[in-house]
Amino acid sequence: MKVIFAGTPDFAAAALKAVAAAGFEIPLVLTQPDRPKGRGMQLTAPPVKQAALELGLRVAQPEKLRNNAEALQMLKEVEADVMVVAAYGLILPQEVLDTPKHGCLNIHASLLPRWRGAAPIQRAIEAGDAETGVCIMQMDIGLDTGDVVSEHRYAIQPTDTANEVHDALMEIGAAAVVADLQQLQSKGRLNAVKQPEEGVTYAQKLSKEEARIDWSESADIIERKIRAFNPVPAAWVEYQGKPMKIRRAEVVAQQGTAGEVLSCSADGLVVACGESALKITELQPAGGRRMNIAAFAAGRSIEAGAKL
């Protein structure tokens, strides 16, 4: 069975490797163009391209698929049975969705229809959801509105960051899409069910500004945001005129004026919130490395009563 693969980041690269390891023929891999990255802004290949080249697969990196006759012709010439799409980052027009014999399967990191859109992992944590998961979806022209082929649940742990949930769902998604491809190969079809009309929510793209901590919010809300925005865009506060990223914190039963430092020791930096307080245990000063609070407190003095 011929499988075109389309994806860009690590989440997708894991799925590509799993599909290849399962023995499916992959005549073409689509990924986004190389982009400048890092402090040196060096042109860097996306993880899917790196994985594809290691596997000896053909790679194409079109800037867009919409109104791109050359890319469409390339896809048609492959005569693929199905396309697997995972965090590709480009819009697939209807003519692309229709090109493979069995259409396009998307690996989506939420329990649809909850958290359609760009940042489902982060929004699930931010909202305090007890669970999330992966859906393999038959793509249509809408935003994550296609019929669901399979659903795989994951319990969000109280200390899970977006990075940790991402890594768990990455493995779940890779295994899930392989299982569905194997079913398609053996039965010639997939049983997909329509998404419920109720329970639809949208996971809007993250912004740096929304990650700025508002101490007037409750400690529970802020703690969830810290985990949801870890590693990027990273929850932050202004400290000595510069942004300081907050990486880990826990809720403590203390009270004070919102934004007031209640204590600072090797055990944690305690800051009052609109309700209860947060004990910050790991942070990252502007231009510096991540550090635990003991290392931070050893070189700096933040007095009780100071404002963050």
From Swiss-Prot:
Q: Which GO terms describe its molecular function?
A: methionyl-tRNA formyltransferase activity
Q: What reactions does this protein catalyze?
A: L-methionyl-tRNA(fMet) + (6R)-10-formyltetrahydrofolate = N-formyl-L-methionyl-tRNA(fMet) + (6S)-5,6,7,8-tetrahydrofolate + H(+)
Keyword match Transferase:
yes
Q: What Enzyme Commission number(s) apply to this enzyme?
A: 2.1.2.9
Q: Which UniProt keywords apply?
A: Protein biosynthesis, Transferase
The region annotated as signal peptide is none
The record ties this protein, via CDD domains, to: FMT_core_Met-tRNA-FMT_N, Met_tRNA_FMT_C
What Gene3D superfamilies would the database entry show? 3.40.50.12230
Q: Which GO terms describe its cellular component?
A: cytosol
InterPro entries tied to this protein: Fmt, Formyl_trans_C, Formyl_transf_N, Formyl_transf_N_sf, Formyl_transferase-like_C_sf, GART_AS, Met-tRNA-FMT_C, Met-tRNA-FMT_N
What are the binding positions for (6S)-5,6,7,8-tetrahydrofolate in this chain? 110-113
Job of this protein: Attaches a formyl group to the free amino group of methionyl-tRNA(fMet). The formyl group appears to play a dual role in the initiator identity of N-formylmethionyl-tRNA by promoting its recognition by IF2 and preventing the misappropriation of this tRNA by the elongation apparatus.
Q: State the PANTHER family in the record.
A: METHIONYL-TRNA FORMYLTRANSFERASE, METHIONYL-TRNA FORMYLTRANSFERASE, MITOCHONDRIAL
Family (UniProt): Belongs to the Fmt family.
| Name listed for the protein in its UniProt record | Methionyl-tRNA formyltransferase
Q: What organism is the protein native to?
A: Neisseria gonorrhoeae (strain ATCC 700825 / FA 1090)
